[in-house]
Amino acid sequence: MRLFLALPVLVVVLAMVLEGPAPTQAAPEISSTFERIPDKLKEFGNTLEDKARAAIETIKQSDIPAKTRKTRNWFSETYSKLKERLKTAFS
C-alpha cells in the first residue's frame, strides 16, 4: 500500500522539480539587481539610523546610566580598598 502512495507522490514531485521555476519566481536580471542596490542600502541605512536613535533614547530615559554610575563607583571603591590592603601587606 505504501508503494502505491509513494510512487505517485514521487512522480508529482519530480515533475514539479523538472518543470523549473515559474516566470514570477525566475531570477531578475543582474543589471536591475545592481540598479536597486543603492536604494536598498539607503533604506537599510535609514532603518538602522532610526533603530539606533530609538535605542539611544530608550537608554537615556531608563535608569541604566544611574546603575552604571553606581557600578563604576563600587568598582573604584573596591579597587582603592584592595590597593590599600596590598600596599599595607607588602610594605
From Swiss-Prot:
Query: What GO molecular function annotations does the UniProt record carry, in alphabetical order?
Result: fatty acid binding; phospholipase inhibitor activity
Question: Which keywords does this Swiss-Prot/TrEMBL entry list?
Answer: Lipid transport, Secreted, Signal, Transport, VLDL
GO biological process terms, alphabetically, are:
lipid transport; lipoprotein metabolic process; negative regulation of cholesterol transport; negative regulation of lipid catabolic process; negative regulation of very-low-density lipoprotein particle clearance; triglyceride metabolic process; very-low-density lipoprotein particle clearance
* Top-level taxonomic group: Eukaryota
Protein localization: Secreted
Q: What is any Pfam family matched here?
A: ApoC-I
Q: Where is the signal peptide?
A: 1-26
Name of the protein described by the UniProt record: Apolipoprotein C-I
Keyword Secreted found: yes
Functionally, this protein is described as follows: Inhibitor of lipoprotein binding to the low density lipoprotein (LDL) receptor, LDL receptor-related protein, and very low density lipoprotein (VLDL) receptor. Associates with high density lipoproteins (HDL) and the triacylglycerol-rich lipoproteins in the plasma and makes up about 10% of the protein of the VLDL and 2% of that of HDL. Appears to interfere directly with fatty acid uptake and is also the major plasma inhibitor of cholesteryl ester transfer protein (CETP). Binds free fatty acids and reduces their intracellular esterification.
What is the similarity comment for this entry? Belongs to the apolipoprotein C1 family.
What's the main place this protein lives? secreted
Q: Which Gene3D superfamilies match?
A: Apolipoprotein C-I (4.10.260.30)
Output the InterPro entries linked to this UniProt entry: ApoC-1_sf, ApoC-I
Give the record's GO CC terms: high-density lipoprotein particle; very-low-density lipoprotein particle
